[in-house]
Amino acid sequence: MIQGSMVALVTPMHADNTLDWDSLHKLVDWHLEQGTHAIVAVGTTGESATLDVQEHLQVIKRVVDQVNGRIPVIAGTGANSTSEAVELTQAAKDVGADACLLVTPYYNKPTQEGLFLHHEYIANAVAIPQYLYNVPGRTGVDMKPETALRLAQVPNIAGIKEATGDLERARLLIDQAPPGFAIISGDDATAVELILLGGQGDISVTANVVPAAIARMCELALAGKAEEARTINTQLLPLHTAMFVESNPIPVKWAVEQLGLIQSGIRLPLTRLSAQYHQQVKTAMQLAGL
């Protein structure tokens, strides 16, 4: 089972918005040095919505190759077309991803039965561990706990990234899910509490900026060292907040650029961080120890 800090990796781009492979390779190595436990390639934070299919798969392959088996790589392969999600998931498996993360179908707003059948179909089509991803604030559809628990019985479905920040929902899932079905936070601010309830880790935006701190926070929480984990989280709360002053990944890409790790590229319709938020993000980074 994949546990701990799973960075939702940004996708580096040159100023002209072409993909920056050198920076991607360096970012992967930096995360390995900093103790990140797994890498999520081409999720929301990785700008999956504005990468074409070839770019999407190239990023996954390059991350897999650079990691070279040292930590797990989870590939973002969700789509609002079931057949497209199957193709992406199979392609990610073919290039060596350890698991896939599949966001609930967005915009077309399927019913709960539609969500179940969508994910069941993909799980039956491709034999790779698959994590459901529930983020209703972005998709316009909320996978109810009952649906997630039905899917937890389906072979190849390994867990869920629950990004609502609702700890009561997380508690219900943790209490009722079968053994081996992972509940993973998709909300940095509440990740410690979810892990302490019995969750397995945090698919983290903030880990792009302070990977060692998020890794340590997750390790402490998994070990049941609640106060120590909470102490780290309290220090990071301004940074968690700053990462969402504008739509993700706008703030986090700007922050990683300030660290000198990537260039300024971000693809329309996303834009660079508005000047009015620069100081807030800088201050949050300083409070986090940077």
Curated annotation (Swiss-Prot):
Site (Part of a proton relay during catalysis): 44, 107
Cellular localisation: Cytoplasm
One function term, GO molecular function aspect: 4-hydroxy-tetrahydrodipicolinate synthase activity
Source taxon at top rank: Bacteria
Record-linked InterPro entries: Aldolase_TIM, DapA, DapA-like, Schiff_base-form_aldolases_AS, Schiff_base-form_aldolases_CS
Residues annotated as catalytic: 133, 161
GO CC terms, sorted: cytosol
Binding residues for pyruvate: 45, 203
Involved pathway(s): Amino-acid biosynthesis; L-lysine biosynthesis via DAP pathway; (S)-tetrahydrodipicolinate from L-aspartate: step 3/4
GO BP terms, alphabetized: diaminopimelate biosynthetic process; lysine biosynthetic process via diaminopimelate
SUPFAM superfamilies associated with the record: Aldolase
PROSITE patterns the UniProt entry points to: DHDPS_1 (PS00665), DHDPS_2 (PS00666)
Chief localization: cytoplasm
Alphabetical list of PANTHER family matching this protein: 4-HYDROXY-2-OXOGLUTARATE ALDOLASE, MITOCHONDRIAL (PTHR12128:SF66), DIHYDRODIPICOLINATE SYNTHASE (PTHR12128)
Family: Belongs to the DapA family.
SUBUNIT field: Homotetramer; dimer of dimers.
Protein name (database record): 4-hydroxy-tetrahydrodipicolinate synthase
Species the sequence originates in: Cellvibrio japonicus (strain Ueda107)
Gene: dapA
